[in-house]
Curated annotation (Swiss-Prot):
Keywords: Antibiotic, Antimicrobial, Fungicide
Induction summary: Constitutively expressed. Not induced by bacterial infection.
Name under which the protein is recorded: Antimicrobial peptide lumbricin-1
Source organism: Lumbricus rubellus
Residue stretch(es) of the prosequence: 1-14
Task of the protein: Displays antimicrobial activity against the Gram-positive bacteria B.subtilis ATCC 62037, S.aureus ATCC 15752 and S.mutans ATCC 25175, the Gram-negative bacteria E.coli ATCC 27325, P.putida ATCC 17426 and Serratia sp. ATCC 21074, and the fungi C.albicans ATCC 10231, C.neoformans ATCC 34881 and S.cerevisiae ATCC 44774. Does not possess hemolytic activity.
Superkingdom to which the source organism belongs: Eukaryota
GO process terms (BP): defense response to bacterium; defense response to fungus; killing of cells of another organism
Length: 76
């Protein structure tokens, strides 16, 4: 949709007046939108299989917890 402002200048509207409407619900209803069983408790974290430590050269060294050994270093 274009509006003619002068003989050579047109104002182009890139959105509809119906797209940008104020949410007319009260605050209590908008707040309750993000409550429920899927938002109450965060999911359980997956325990890490490797621990990343950095050496003096700035390269990562992967250690497997519990074994104390080193995994293969990262490829450069």
């Amino acid at each position: 949709m274009s509006l003619c402002i002068s003989d050579y200048l047109y104002l182009t509207l890139t959105f509809s007046k119906y797209e940008r409407q104020k949410d007319k619900r009260p605050y209590s209803e908008r707040k309750n939108q993000y409550t429920g069983p899927q938002f109450l408790y965060p999911p359980e974290r997956i325990p890490p299989q490797k621990v990343i430590k950095w050496n003096e050269e700035g390269l990562p060294i992967y250690e497997i917890p519990g074994e104390g050994g080193h995994a293969e270093p990262a490829a450069a």
